[in-house]
Amino acid sequence: MGLLSKKTKQVEIENFPPIGGIMVSKMIIEEHKKPMFMYRNKRDNVNDSGWRIFSGFESDEYTEDPNNAGIYAPSTILEIDPSIAELLLQGGFGSVFERKSYQSPWYRVTDFPLEDDYMVRHRLTDRWELDINNLFERKIEEDGDLLYTTGDKSLRIAIWNCENKTKAEIYAEKKQTVANRDESRAKTLKVFDFSDEKIARIGYMIKESDERREYNVIFGSSIIDNQEIFIAFYFDDDENLTWAIETWKGIKLIG
């Protein structure tokens, strides 16, 4: 586990984003205990945030009884403990946090088992497949791109046909683009080349930001003759660089 440390703006409870309902132990709601442990499952529906919050005093028997928890709006739990506001926004599906006392900081937990946390294989086309964690939600966007996201990590995929161009030709064009990109808005932090005999892979990493936070972005290409898969990875934590690289390599040819 590691100490949670983020550079984000203070969240206003009265203007808290509509993330969906939160399942909260009644020890918190009715017995007025503070949250001490929380995790985020893959949500059941669009009205479910996926968050499950506990006081840390619940027994297994208590937790297994559905009558001992309820679904509440974020504002209800934030009135009890506003310290979790940033966690509710920062933590994607699969996130787990705990703290040792009411006064101590929250820590990210990395060894708590979640039922939806396992790898799956998705077929992208008749030639490509992807290995990715089941915690990611998948949807097709209006422009036809394929989006996978947990909330704090995202992967966007576009498949481009490049008729009458060899893998070497497409790769050379992409390499030139990376080398000559305009860095006035975002500096190139890393350049990647994971090419092998079957697939050419090239890309780069930058940082972008919105009104709340700064995050990492990797733009990459996986290339074969006549076709390119363009991939954009978005992730908040630097430690998720390994996730992005391994997921990129997990986009592979079938067979």
Where are these predicted regions, by residue range?
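Acidic, aromatic-enriched beta-alpha/helix-loop junctions
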Residues: 38-88, 162-187
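Surface-exposed amphipathic alpha-helical segments
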Residues: 134-136, 229-255
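Short, compact, well-ordered microdomains
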Residues: 71-114, 225-229
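Secretory pathway targeting signatures of secreted, lumenal, and periplasmic proteins
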Residues: 45, 126-173
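Short, hydrophobic/aromatic-rich segments at coil-to-beta transitions
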Residues: 21, 35, 116-121, 144-145, ...
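Short, surface-exposed coil-to-beta transition loops
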Residues: 48, 141-144, 211-219, 243-246
